[in-house]
Amino acid sequence: MGIESTSHTFGVGIVKYVSSINETRILANTYDKYIPEKGGIHPREAALHHARVAAKVLSDALQKANISMRDVSAIAVALGPGLGPCLRVGASLARFLSSYYNIPLIPVNHAVAHIEIGKFLFGFKDPLIIYVSGGNTLIAIQRKKRYRILGETLDIPIGNLLDTFAREIGLAPPYIVNGKHQVDICAEWGSEFISLPYTVKGSDLSFSGLLTAALSLAEKYIDNKKKLGNVCLSLRETAFNMLVEVAERSLVLAGKKEVLLVGGVASNKVLRKKLELMASLHGAKYAGTPPEYSGDNGAMIAYTGLLGYLHNVIVEPRKAFVRQRWRLDEVELPWIQD
C-alpha cells in the first residue's frame, strides 16, 4: 500500500506482486484533491483537507482492491519533498498503520515515484527522464544507483509558471477544465506568436523572466480575447520549446534510446507531441505517463514502495521523518542496474 500526501492530493494506491511469475498489478489508485477557492495552495488548509478525507480514501482503496488491512504486507509513504503540513498527514497515518498492524514501513521519495511508475507502465529500462510538474522541472538519467540530474529549472518549475499565469490573469482556479489547462484553452483564442524571454543555459532553464514578461503583456490585453490568446499561445510555446531544447541536448549527450515524460504536466497534449517528435528524430522510443498516473497518486508510491520492500529499504516508524526538501539525486536506489 502506498500513501501520497505531498501537496494538493491525498491518495492511496495498492499493488500486488506475484513472485511466481514476477508480475506486478495495480489493484487500486484512489485519491481526493484539495482545490482552493482562490489563490494557490494553502499548506495548512490542504493538510486539513487530507486529514478529513484520509479514512474514506483508504477505505475506498481497500474496497477497490477487494482486500482488508490484514492482507497488506507493507506500507509505503511519500516522506518528501513537499509541503510540511501535508507530508505530516500521510506520514502520521503510515506510521500508525505500520505500528498497529506490525508491517514494514518503506520511505519513498515523491520524485523517484513519478519516474518509477512511468518506467513500470512502459517497460523502460534506461530512459532519458523529463520530469515536469508544479514543483519540479528537470532532466535526469540513471547512473550508479541514483538518478543524476543533467539539467533543471534555476527558479520556478514549468507547472508553477502555467498555474501562476492562469491565476494572475483571472482564468484559474480551476486550473484544468475537461482535461485541458486554462493556458491551453486561452491559447486557442490566439493565432499570433509574440517574442518572449527565452532563457536556456546549457541544459538548465529559467522561467521567471518569461512569466514576468507574459503577465505584463496580459495586463494590457485583459479585455481583448484574441490578443490575450496570443499571449497564452506565446507563453506556452516558448516554455515548451525551451524544455524540448534542453531535453534534445541531453538526449544526444547521454545517448539514450528511450525518452520518458513524467509528472503532472506530462498530461499536456501539446508538450507530449513536441517531445514525441523530438524523440523520433533521434530514433528514440517515447512515452508519457497517462493522466491517471502523471499527477500525484498513491499507486506510484505503492509501486516504488514495492521496489524498496524487495530490496530491504525499510525504516522504523519512529524514524520516518518527513523531508520538505529532498532532491531526486540524493536518493540511493539499490534496484537500479547500471
UniProtKB/Swiss-Prot annotation:
Its EC number is 2.3.1.234. One of its GO terms (molecular function) is iron ion binding. Fe cation binds at residues 110, 114, 131, 296. It is found in: Cytoplasm. The keyword Metal-binding applies. GO terms for cellular component: cytoplasm; EKC/KEOPS complex. Transmembrane segments: none annotated. Its cofactor is Fe(2+). Signal peptide: none annotated. Binds 1 Fe(2+) ion per subunit. It comes from the Archaea. GO terms for biological process: tRNA threonylcarbamoyladenosine modification. Keywords: Acyltransferase, Cytoplasm, Iron, Metal-binding, Transferase, tRNA processing. It catalyses: L-threonylcarbamoyladenylate + adenosine(37) in tRNA = N(6)-L-threonylcarbamoyladenosine(37) in tRNA + AMP + H(+). Pfam families: TsaD. Substrate binds at residues 131-135, 163, 184, 268. Belongs to the KAE1 / TsaD family. NCBIfam families: arch_KAE1 (TIGR03722), gcp_kae1 (TIGR00329). Required for the formation of a threonylcarbamoyl group on adenosine at position 37 (t(6)A37) in tRNAs that read codons beginning with adenine. Is probably involved in the transfer of the threonylcarbamoyl moiety of threonylcarbamoyl-AMP (TC-AMP) to the N6 group of A37. PANTHER family: TRNA N6-ADENOSINE THREONYLCARBAMOYLTRANSFERASE. This is tRNA N6-adenosine threonylcarbamoyltransferase. The gene is kae1.
